[in-house]
Amino acid sequence: MSEAKRLAAEKAIDYVEDGMIVGVGTGSTVAYFIDALGHIGHRIKGAVSSSEQSTARLRQHGIEVLDLNHTGNLSLYVDGADECDPNRCLIKGGGAALTREKIIAEASERFICIVDPSKQVPVLGKFPLPVEVIPMARSLVARQILALTGGQPVWRDGVVTDNGNVVLDVHNLQITDPVALERSLNQIPGVVCVGLFARRPADVVIVGGEPPRVL
């Protein structure tokens, strides 16, 4: 699948225009995108990064990393996904960067999602749904998620997000209405961010292959 990831990432470079500030996500597919972006780094103003991991890789390529508070809205955001449904709704957060990813997606005019074919699903939920939670609310949120969804929340032990929070992964879901579930989970006190990108789905999904498919 690494070749499919690389092909999807390189296709996303087609959407990068001269003088842009590019929003950059996190994960193994995005790493290929950052490497490809490095070849045209002289053409862009810089990048806004969703994680310390991506920031380090961008800087290795000599790309300036900028603060979203100083850039205003972005023209383009490129990120991967753990699952993608036919409506371009996504599960994200396997790398625990979901909150910053969602912030950058919201600030961007266009969200390009790059995936390998294994990430395409008819219904979201086989991949456990990440939920970023304030540490003191972990047990409370887990109980409320169980009551609300019937899914099984599991604490991702040992993982602390770049924001200093913890992650619950919710197993055994079949998400037939992602927008409604995203809204409901966001109402639970202590929830920082839900790894459903449904209210703001991807605008374009690029599926790696020979040739890549654009959805």
From Swiss-Prot:
It comes from the Bacteria. Pathway: Carbohydrate degradation; pentose phosphate pathway; D-ribose 5-phosphate from D-ribulose 5-phosphate (non-oxidative stage): step 1/1. The active site is at E101. InterPro entries: NagB/RpiA_transferase-like, Ribose5P_isomerase_typA_subgr, Ribose5P_isomerase_type_A. Keywords: Isomerase. Its EC number is 5.3.1.6. The keyword Isomerase applies. The keyword Cell inner membrane does not apply. Substrate binds at T26, G27, S28, T29, D79, G80, A81, D82, K92, G93, G94, G95, K119. It is an enzyme of class 5 (isomerase). Pfam families: Rib_5-P_isom_A. One of its GO terms (cellular component) is cytosol. GO terms for molecular function: ribose-5-phosphate isomerase activity. GO terms for biological process: D-ribose metabolic process; pentose-phosphate shunt, non-oxidative branch. It catalyses: aldehydo-D-ribose 5-phosphate = D-ribulose 5-phosphate. Homodimer. Catalyzes the reversible conversion of ribose-5-phosphate to ribulose 5-phosphate. Belongs to the ribose 5-phosphate isomerase family. NCBIfam families: PRK00702.1, rpiA. This is Ribose-5-phosphate isomerase A. It comes from Xanthomonas oryzae pv. oryzae (strain MAFF 311018). The gene is rpiA.
